């Protein structure tokens, strides 16, 4: 027993009590000073503190201060009796008679003196929150609870023999071990008010390299127990909001301390995009409270990364680390919410929920990463097109412009790295970068976060995949070398659980292309046909990403291209603003110059650049859902005609420019003028080709439903 004082905290409304010889049991009221016996109050909590605790409690901002117990408040020598802070005896009869005054009292095993409390669960009849509704408690505790608690303790001590310590997180995250996970998180109590401190506590308590499903399950359980304990108003008693913040912090940590990522997320980017995800979950949140809290989290995390759990050096651990051939789990998605299902190597990185902010509404709102995150977390994916009467039937017609769903070959996305150094984007007080776990080393096979630049090259390996194009989105379930699940027998939920990895991409601004030349598949000399889908760099990624696919027949490849192009054309808004710089600067074809009102020797040329990128000029994504297919068709016809006129006009400049600039003695000026002309021509032509392709695909699809 601690001599004069026993530290305690007012903690969550659920606690398993362990009758150890060195533990003491107290009842603490809301004010931490009033006896529950004399003044029972809603929110009172039963709290057990072990004298020989192996962890020091984390201090965090806003955490309830530690209080000193008086000698009178200590446990009496009678084992199992509960005593209030002023020494009043709390009997089982009192607890039974006042269930409405106690949120939850969950006692798995007390000794004989308090045997009447064995297995009792008392929950408040008032103000029950979403966790209580979601996770109802049975009247009697299962005998498995004691076993689960024992296993959880062994995992916390790194002594659970049946599983390697590096696989503890995977073990806890599996659905069949959910009760063990609950007990494990309960052993980390009290969880700090600060979610970052709570995440640190978890990170240093277990080897946190695991499949995404396992990590997600652990964060979910921590979120549930955190909300049961803490009641900040801006979290609305909603564990999903906590889950989003925890997940965002974890991914931010990987971004800040990933040596391969030169451009780090700024505080504003992290805050804005996390708040956006929170608003998607609950539109009524207090934005200012979350923004202030997230800014503090960013600053703290920028100074010190999440700790890596290092278990005691033992012979068994040494053997584990010396055997790199053993299966190392990867961050895979788990069936739970928008991007949390059971897949095995989810391709979402920092952009999954804390999205890269760019000037485009696409990147800021409905990016491909948001689609993946929502799909992973079982959130309903928003409708991103204007639904019409013919859509109900066509959305269920495979091998059509509306739906393509087949097993084909898939190669992980290609993308070049063009990240600029971004030291200025990181807090100047940040300490030197340290590697984040083993996750983020280049080429590390068990990396849980895949960066875009790690994707395969044109000579990369092909994998079995189920690929689906439907309602404006591309779904890829990568089964690696295992047989992919047939769409006829497996739904999307089963694919999420079985796939090695998966991704969901919105087709905003995407471009699908068919490879005309057939390819001989090297392994079996089988003729195959390729197609690719490229996403603009402003959508979820700083560089263009190209997904490559391979089919066994030409027709299927062409149909995939048509479906992808149709949906891109249908949902991608057309540029509605000026997309070229309007200024008095001269690029080599100014009206006064071409009419010879100004001599070439008297002008100073400037490099021509588009005002913004081709795919950064769309209106808000939500607006695209207001247009019918027919309206989008008309707009595309008008826009492509406008681009045709611009191209014709630009081509007419060329002869005059050559005549004028060849007379200029400056070769450098001539080359600069020609380069400007060529750059603008390529820009306009690329816009024309893309939108003309959209127009043809939309016309082809529309004809099938209008005759």
Curated annotation (Swiss-Prot):
**Disulfide pairings:** none
Q: Which Pfam families match?
A: PH_GEF_YEL1 (PF23633), Sec7 (PF01369)
InterPro entries reported in the protein's UniProt record: PH_GEF_YEL1, Sec7_C_sf, Sec7_dom, Sec7_dom_sf
GO cellular component assignments: cellular bud neck; cellular bud tip; cytoplasm; plasma membrane
Q: Molecular function (GO) terms listed?
A: guanyl-nucleotide exchange factor activity
Q: How does it sit in the membrane?
A: Peripheral membrane protein
Reading the lineage from the top rank, the first entry is: Eukaryota
Sorted alphabetically, the keyword list is: Cell membrane, Cytoplasm, Guanine-nucleotide releasing factor, Membrane
State the residue spans of region: Disordered: 127-148
Question: Where does this one sit in the cell?
Answer: Cytoplasm; Cell membrane; Bud neck; Bud tip
What is the protein's known function?
Guanine nucleotide exchange factor for ARF3 required for localization of ARF3 to the bud neck and tip and involved in actin patch polarization.
Q: Which family does it belong to?
A: Belongs to the YEL1 family.
| Protein name per the record | Guanine-nucleotide exchange factor YEL1
What organism is listed for this UniProt entry?
Answer: Eremothecium gossypii (strain ATCC 10895 / CBS 109.51 / FGSC 9923 / NRRL Y-1056)
């Amino acid at each position: 027993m601690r001599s004069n004082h026993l530290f305690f905290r007012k903690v969550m409304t659920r606690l398993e009590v362990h009758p150890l010889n060195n533990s003491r049991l107290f009842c603490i009221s809301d004010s931490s000073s009033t006896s529950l016996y004399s003044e029972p109050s809603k929110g009172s909590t039963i709290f057990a503190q072990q004298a020989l605790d192996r962890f020091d409690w984390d201090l965090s901002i806003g955490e309830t201060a530690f209080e000193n117990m008086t000698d009178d408040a200590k446990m009496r020598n009678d084992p199992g009796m509960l005593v209030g802070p002023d020494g009043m005896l709390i009997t089982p009869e009192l607890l039974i008679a006042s269930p409405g005054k106690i949120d939850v009292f969950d006692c798995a095993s007390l000794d004989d003196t308090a045997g009447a409390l064995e297995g009792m669960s008392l929950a408040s009849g008032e103000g029950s929150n979403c966790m209580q509704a979601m996770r109802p408690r049975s009247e009697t505790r299962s005998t498995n609870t004691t076993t689960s608690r024992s296993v959880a303790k062994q995992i916390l001590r790194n002594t659970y023999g049946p599983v390697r310590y590096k696989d503890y997180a995977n073990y806890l995250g599996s659905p069949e071990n959910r009760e063990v996970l609950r007990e494990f998180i309960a052993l980390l109590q009290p969880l700090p008010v600060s979610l970052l401190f709570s995440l640190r506590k978890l990170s240093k308590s277990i080897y946190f390299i695991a499949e995404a499903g396992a990590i997600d399950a652990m964060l979910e359980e921590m979120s549930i127990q955190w909300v049961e304990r803490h009641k900040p108003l801006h979290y609305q008693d909603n564990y999903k909001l906590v889950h989003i913040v925890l997940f965002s912090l974890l991914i931010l940590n990987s971004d800040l301390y990933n040596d391969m990522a030169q451009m780090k997320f700024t505080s504003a980017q992290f805050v804005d995009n996390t708040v956006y995800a929170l608003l998607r979950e609950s539109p009524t949140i207090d934005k200012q409270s979350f923004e202030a809290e997230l800014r503090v989290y960013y600053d703290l995390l920028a100074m010190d990364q999440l700790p890596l759990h290092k278990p005691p050096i033992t012979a068994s651990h040494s053997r584990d680390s010396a055997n790199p051939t053993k299966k190392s789990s990867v961050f895979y998605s788990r069936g739970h919410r928008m991007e949390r299902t059971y897949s095995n190597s989810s391709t979402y990185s920092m952009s999954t929920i804390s999205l890269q902010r760019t000037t485009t509404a696409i990147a800021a709102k409905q990016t491909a990463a948001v689609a993946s995150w929502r799909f992973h977390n079982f959130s309903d994916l928003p409708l991103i097109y204007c639904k019409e009467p013919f859509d109900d039937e066509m959305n269920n017609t495979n091998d059509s412009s509306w739906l393509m769903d087949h097993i084909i070959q898939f190669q992980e996305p290609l993308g070049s790295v063009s990240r600029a150094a971004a030291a200025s984007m990181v807090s100047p007080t940040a300490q030197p970068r340290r590697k984040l776990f083993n996750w983020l080393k280049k080429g590390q096979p068990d990396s849980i976060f895949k960066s875009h630049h790690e994707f395969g090259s044109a000579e990369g390996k092909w994998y079995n995949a189920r690929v689906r194009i439907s309602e404006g989105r591309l779904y890829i379930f990568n089964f690696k070398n295992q047989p992919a699940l047939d769409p006829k027998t497996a739904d999307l939920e089963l694919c999420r659980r079985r796939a090695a990895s998966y991704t969901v991409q919105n087709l905003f601004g995407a471009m699908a292309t068919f490879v005309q030349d057939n390819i001989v598949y090297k392994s079996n000399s089988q003729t195959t046909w390729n197609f690719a889908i490229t996403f603009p760099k402003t959508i979820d990624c700083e560089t263009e990403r190209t997904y490559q696919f391979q089919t066994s027949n030409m027709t299927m490849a062409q149909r995939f291209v048509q479906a992808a192009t149709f949906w891109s054309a249908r949902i991608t808004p057309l540029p509605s603003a000026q997309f070229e710089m309007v200024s008095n600067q001269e690029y080599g074809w100014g009206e006064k110059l071409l009419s010879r009102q100004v001599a070439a020797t008297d002008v100073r040329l400037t490099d021509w650049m588009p005002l913004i990128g081709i795919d950064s000029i769309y209106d808000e994504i939500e607006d695209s859902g207001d247009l019918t297919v027919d309206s989008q068709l008309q707009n595309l016809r008008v826009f492509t005609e406008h681009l045709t006129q611009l191209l014709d006009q630009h081509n007419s400049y060329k002869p005059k420019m050559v005549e004028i600039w060849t007379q200029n003695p400056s070769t450098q000026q001539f080359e600069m003028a020609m380069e400007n002309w060529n750059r603008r021509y390529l820009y306009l032509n690329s816009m024309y080709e893309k939108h003309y392709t959209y127009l043809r695909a939309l016309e082809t699809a529309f004809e099938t439903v209008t005759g």
